Amino acid sequence: MSTDRYEIDRGKDFGHLEHAPIVEAVIEIKCPPQVPWNEDTIPDEVGKLLSGYQLLDSRSEYSQTVNFEDNVPIPESMEKVGWKGVRYRSEDESYIAAFNRDGFVFSRVGRYETWEKFSAEASRVWKVHRSLARPSDVHRIGLRFINRIRLPGSGIDLDDFIYPGPQPPKNLGFPIVSFLHKDTFAVPGNPYLINIIRTSSPSPSAGGDVDYAIILDIDVYLQETFEVDDLKIEGHLEDMRILKNEVFWGSIPRPLLENLRGDSG
């Protein structure tokens, strides 16, 4: 296992996948506000500054008290501990932005287009959060892409759709009904960590047809504190995008990649 510094090539061109299986893309910036984060004022302030979006919901945080009786947990009560934040959704329902007490979350749901469009809109909306919250420090940045790869049916070789594919124990040739696998990787010489989850969704039921798919969930993140700096944040996100692409392209067998590429080449 090499521990040499991994050079992240920001200029690397991965090409375009016309049929990319992305179902959600998320940017998260953990940065506590330096001003009061009040339910009475923040939702309206966001609405005034954020064009092209409408209020989706307002969310609170709760704690649950659990008692034990004969070593069996018994939930007792839910208590509101504070207001978490507000979510706004774009008028075309393709973006959701969360303005939270602990930071900012921006999601693309549905059909993904390009990184340039996604990151540009995230940057625009992030500036609204920054202007209201006035954070001084960033504690975590995350970039997460969730892919759903549909399978044509049962009785297929999963190695044709995901690498590495799930395997039974060496001494047992049992068929795989469902699987869940998680890895966390460090990037040598860089401050990033990568969580990779490969799982089946939904699990097939005995005797019934199901829409069977593989979920490839890639989460690249940086967990260290630095002063808020938009150029620095953009640089980290660009590094994370490259790492995310490296993981995706290294997880999908070439014949499937060609199918996902489509006619655009």
Q: Which stretches of residues belong to each language-model region?
A:
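Short glycine-rich, low-complexity/disordered patches
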Residues: 56-70, 131-149, 176-178, 246-265
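Long, compositionally biased interface segments
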Residues: 211-265
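Short, charged/polar micro-motifs that form catalytic or ligand-binding hotspots
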Residues: 17, 32, 36, 105-116, ...
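Aromatic/basic-lined ligand-recognition segments
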Residues: 12-14, 78-92, 96, 107, ...
